[in-house]
């Protein structure tokens, strides 16, 4: 592989099992692949080219002709800026295989953080808005959200788990919306914080006991709805751990203060806030 992250034709030949002669023949005959050229005229293939060629070779092994396999690949190719629309449409028609292929394409193109920002979160928002507008039913919303939540869990797993006493991340009792908590755990892990995501709707006594057993110095709670928070008594979060952060659209500074937590305005700066001592002057993070 060259220093710029692309491959020579010899490397592609070894990686795909397709000969250099075949690659040049396809380029002349079908206009695919379309490698870049060095000033000296040598072909350079991207990682996406390599993945495409592996897919096409698999179809050839299944009995397709080169022409049919290349046409099939080009027909399904989507520009990065159109991936969101394609993913949403695939989910709403129940095409999970197609949705998975689009997610993988986005992951290859943007990487984990980029696919989260440019694909998963926009599609999640659009699914929620479509449900609120009455354009899709509960079943479609559940299907799409389940797929997207699973991909977010995959990104969370890819982020690894840094060493050290864990930071426990969950939602308050009665709060089933977990995307905000998953995002908090993901961003903390990317910042080197050992965030342990527990899932949603964790009973406070169990959360308190786990924090003590694992030696967790911090608990982070994300709330989308305000009702579960209002149902909690004053100081309910105070002794979950030495530090407790509460955030999300259902929370606010005054409610956090009432419950005995530090208010987390957004995810930006949360990791840094974990290293700062708690003080009365820090009512919002």
Swiss-Prot record:
Residues 6-76 form the HTH merR-type domain. InterPro entries: Cbl-bd_cap, Cobalamin-bd_sf, DNA-bd_dom_put_sf, MerR-type_HTH_dom, MerR_fam, Meth_synthase_dom. Disulfide bonds: none annotated. SUPFAM superfamilies: Cobalamin (vitamin B12)-binding domain (SSF52242), Putative DNA-binding domain (SSF46955). It comes from the Bacteria. Keywords: Carotenoid biosynthesis, DNA-binding, Plasmid, Repressor, Transcription, Transcription regulation. The keyword Lipoprotein does not apply. Residues 164-285 form the B12-binding domain. SMART domains: HTH_MERR. Gene3D superfamilies: 1.10.1660.10, Cobalamin-binding domain (3.40.50.280), Methionine synthase domain (1.10.1240.10). GO terms for molecular function: cobalamin binding; DNA binding; DNA-binding transcription factor activity; metal ion binding. Requires cobalamin (vitamin B12) for repressor activity. In the dark, binding of cobalamin to CarH induces its oligomerization, which enhances binding to the DNA and repressor activity. Light causes cobalamin photolysis and disruption of the cobalamin-CarH complex, which decreases interaction with DNA and allows transcription of the target genes. Negative regulator of genes involved in carotenoid biosynthesis. Belongs to the CarA/CarH B12-binding photoregulator family. The N-terminal region interacts with DNA, and the C-terminal region is involved in oligomerization and binding of cobalamin. This is HTH-type transcriptional repressor CarH. It comes from Thermus thermophilus (strain ATCC 27634 / DSM 579 / HB8). The gene is carH.
